[in-house]
Amino acid sequence: EFYRTIILQSLKLKKFDYALNIINGYKKDLHPERRENMHLYACALYNFYSGNFEEALSHCQRVKLNHFALKIDLKSLMLMICYELDQEISANSIIDSFRHFITNNRILSVAERRKQKSFIEVITKLFMLRRSGNLSYGYELKKLIANDLPYKKWIEEKLLDLKVIKRKDRK
């Protein structure tokens, strides 16, 4: 949806006031069946990009997954939040359900399925790298992020935090 795209791009550009105006100002224009869930998801995104991870998670947990595209977006966001909050056990549960969803869903294209599986693999390896400090996971991650991945910039930031890549290595 256009609402989601505008908010996501605004947040990626750190235009928080603009995003908040869109989130609240255009809620009434959303389709009534999706309005509340899209608004909750938008609030979760806003809080995630603002660094309010607990609040972001709270919004995510209130979303009812009745919209196909939202399921993928929400699970990805929840995985990133779990990483930020160092909640590996919760992340493992989400990873398991996300894998089943991707594997069993025939609506997703092969390319989209591959992209989402790669994202899950990256998140899994990020947790392993942070927990173990084993740089071999980092080198595997560097190879994986060369591909088309959702939230690639966020992943690169996490690799920077873990000292796997240097600023000049980012594309």
Where are these regions (language model features)?
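Long, K/E/R/D-enriched contiguous segments that form extended
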Residues: 1-30
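Generic helix N-cap/helix-start motif at coil->alpha-helix transitions
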Residues: 1-4, 32-42, 69-74
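"A position-specific structural signal for the A-helix of alpha-solenoid helical repeats
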Residues: 4-5, 41-45, 49, 75-84, ...
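Solenoid-like repeat scaffolds
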Residues: 24-34, 61-70, 97-108, 144-146
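Short coil/turn linking the two alpha-helices of tandem helical-hairpin repeats
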Residues: 33-34, 49, 71, 84-87
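C-terminal non-catalytic interaction modules
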Residues: 89-171
